[in-house]
């Protein structure tokens, strides 16, 4: 191979490798942050669902208490 073409080939390889490395170094942290945010959103939805169930149970107990108090005579 002629030395002129070898130099062009090496420079081209350096440019391509640098672009790929920049792309991967930008892609990997972005992918990690996307996965962690999805995990946090899933956990948050579960917490909100459990709070909703807790409030439903609380309202049911409150209604049971109202029924119990309504059975007592008024003094």
From Swiss-Prot:
Expressed by the venom gland. Residues 1-22 form the signal peptide. The keyword Metal-binding does not apply. Residues 47-75 form a propeptide. Keywords: Amidation, Antibiotic, Antimicrobial, Cleavage on pair of basic residues, Cytolysis, Fungicide, Membrane, Secreted, Signal, Target cell membrane, Target membrane, Transmembrane. The modification Lysine amide is found at residue 41. GO terms for biological process: defense response to bacterium; defense response to fungus; killing of cells of another organism. GO terms for cellular component: extracellular region; membrane; other organism cell membrane. Its main location: secreted. The keyword Secreted applies. It is found in: Secreted; Target cell membrane. It comes from the Eukaryota. Amphipathic and cationic peptide with an alpha-helical structure. Belongs to the non-disulfide-bridged peptide (NDBP) superfamily. Short antimicrobial peptide (group 4) family. Negative results: has no activity against Gram-negative bacteria (E.coli and P.aeruginosa). Inhibits hepatitis B virus replication in the HepG2.2.15 cell line by about 30%. Antimicrobial peptide that acts by breaking the cell wall. Is active against Gram-positive bacteria, fungi and antibiotic-resistant pathogens: S.aureus (MIC=5 ug/ml), M.luteus (MIC=5 ug/ml), B.thuringiensis (MIC=10 ug/ml), B.subtilis (MIC=10 ug/ml), C.albicans (MIC=20 ug/ml), methicillin-resistant S.aureus (MIC=5-10 ug/ml), and penicillin-resistant S.epidermidis (MIC=10 ug/ml). Also shows potent activity against antibiotic-sensitive and -resistant Acinetobacter baumannii (MIC=10-20 uM). Shows cytolytic activity against human erythrocytes. This is Antimicrobial peptide ctriporin. It comes from Chaerilus tricostatus (Scorpion).
């Amino acid at each position: 191979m002629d030395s002129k073409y070898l130099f062009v080939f090496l420079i081209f390889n350096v440019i391509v490798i640098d672009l790929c490395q920049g792309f991967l170094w930008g892609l990997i942290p972005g992918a990690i942050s996307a996965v962690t945010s999805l995990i946090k959103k899933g956990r948050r939805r579960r917490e909100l669902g459990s709070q909703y169930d807790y409030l439903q149970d609380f309202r049911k107990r409150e209604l049971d208490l109202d029924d119990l108090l309504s059975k007592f005579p008024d003094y």
